Amino acid sequence: MTNIRKTHPLMKIVNSSFIDLPAPSNISSWWNFGSLLGICLIAQILTGLFLAMHYTSDTMTAFSSVTHICRDVNYGWLIRYLHANGASMFFICLFLHVGRGLYYGSYLYLETWNIGVLLLFAVMATAFMGYVLPWGQMSFWGATVITNLLSAIPYIGTNLVEWIWGGFSVDKATLTRFFAFHFILPFVVAALAGVHLLFLHETGSNNPSGLNSDTDKVPFHPYYTIKDILGVLIMITVLSSLVLFSPDMLGDPDNYIPANPLNTPPHIKPEWYFLFAYAILRSIPNKLGGVLALVLSILILMLIPFLHTAKQRSMMFRPMSQCMFWILVADLFTLTWIGGQPVEHPFVVIGQLASVIYFLMILLIMPITSMIENQLSKW
């Protein structure tokens, strides 16, 4: 008799995705981040659900309701900080996952890659709206500054901003709709992640060598289930250490001051995971130019498959490209640092240089480096 996991309509899907899935025998720990992102998403949806039970999306009570969660709800402080720092873990895993894709040429699976970029956009939108909900100073001013950027769109800009705000400034209507969107978007992300996996399983996973691995596959379970569980345990250790020892390390102290439209914080800045994009936005003195650069800094990922000039897929055997890749990583760290600094000399110039290097690396330097490597290896 055939095993039930291979015949039952629902279990068959689980079986072909997580149990009998043929996986390359040599995928490294860099391939763990997909499963970690899945765990992060589930954790965020669950903690978010419990927070939503006690949260009120009204400008008069939002800040107080978050205080109430932390003080009066059983383990409310734990749920709140797991949710806030869980977002940071989510983005750490996202950036490493994207970095892995860039390094090993996984972007050549076009559908999987493009849906991944859409996922990145959706998660960033969710995180932005979630940051507005506690209705602290940084929540309010962050929402004001970022939504205001849309006014740079010619002709419809001002109307668009007021439509999003639901009035003439960020107020009750804005908070209520942001809460609604923040609640629904993670489920959209979950659906997109399902499609992401669907397309991935059409081709199978890439591997560190970038070569076809059809001749050497192993079943996903038990090999990679065990490997993924180790990754999950490490992530839980890091997250719980962060939550239990220094829950506010990655947050902004200004967000413990209730939102006040009459008082602007000295330095308006987003959460750390948006700082690189924020630095690119600020490095251009023109409003529309800055907004375009901000969007392109992520959208440029969709161009990467078309900029692949190398004969080999992975960077594993391409030392010059490796060097360029790590310069790009260092540049992103620089941008993240600059995004958190005030707008003054020398930070402005460093930010502008780092922004130019970011776009030059991806659009010009890395494709040219690959061409040089092709010549050197006598292809």
UniProtKB/Swiss-Prot annotation:
Any Pfam family matching the protein: Cytochrom_B_C
Required cofactor(s): heme b
Binding-site list for heme b b566: H97, H196
Annotated source species: Crocidura orii (Amami shrew)
Keyword GTP-binding part of the UniProt annotation: no
Domain of life the protein comes from: Eukaryota
Compartments in which it is found: Mitochondrion inner membrane
Primary localization: mitochondrion
One BP annotation, GO: mitochondrial electron transport, ubiquinol to cytochrome c
Sequence positions that bind a ubiquinone: H201
Function: Component of the ubiquinol-cytochrome c reductase complex (complex III or cytochrome b-c1 complex) that is part of the mitochondrial respiratory chain. The b-c1 complex mediates electron transfer from ubiquinol to cytochrome c. Contributes to the generation of a proton gradient across the mitochondrial membrane that is then used for ATP synthesis.
UniProt cofactor note: Binds 2 heme b groups non-covalently.
Keywords on record: Electron transport, Heme, Iron, Membrane, Metal-binding, Mitochondrion, Mitochondrion inner membrane, Respiratory chain, Transmembrane, Transmembrane helix, Transport, Ubiquinone
Gene expressing this chain: MT-CYB
Note: Heme 1 (or BL or b562) is low-potential and absorbs at about 562 nm, and heme 2 (or BH or b566) is high-potential and absorbs at about 566 nm.
Membrane-protein topology: Multi-pass membrane protein
Signal peptide segment: none
Subunit structure: The cytochrome bc1 complex contains 11 subunits: 3 respiratory subunits (MT-CYB, CYC1 and UQCRFS1), 2 core proteins (UQCRC1 and UQCRC2) and 6 low-molecular weight proteins (UQCRH/QCR6, UQCRB/QCR7, UQCRQ/QCR8, UQCR10/QCR9, UQCR11/QCR10 and a cleavage product of UQCRFS1). This cytochrome bc1 complex then forms a dimer.
Family stated for the protein in its record: Belongs to the cytochrome b family.
PROSITE patterns tied to this protein: CYTB_CTER, CYTB_NTER
Protein known as: Cytochrome b
Transmembrane segments: 33-53, 77-98, 113-133, 178-198, 226-246, 288-308, 320-340, 347-367
Binding residues annotated for heme b b562, in chain numbering: H83, H182
Cited InterPro entries: Cyt_b/b6_C, Cyt_b/b6_C_sf, Cyt_b/b6_N, Cytb/b6-like_sf, Cytochrome_b, Cytochrome_b_C_euk/bac, Cytochrome_b_N_euk/bac, Di-haem_cyt_TM
GO molecular function term, any single one: ubiquinol-cytochrome-c reductase activity
Classification via SUPFAM superfamilies: a domain/subunit of cytochrome bc1 complex (Ubiquinol-cytochrome c reductase), Transmembrane di-heme cytochromes
Entry GO CC: mitochondrial inner membrane; respiratory chain complex III
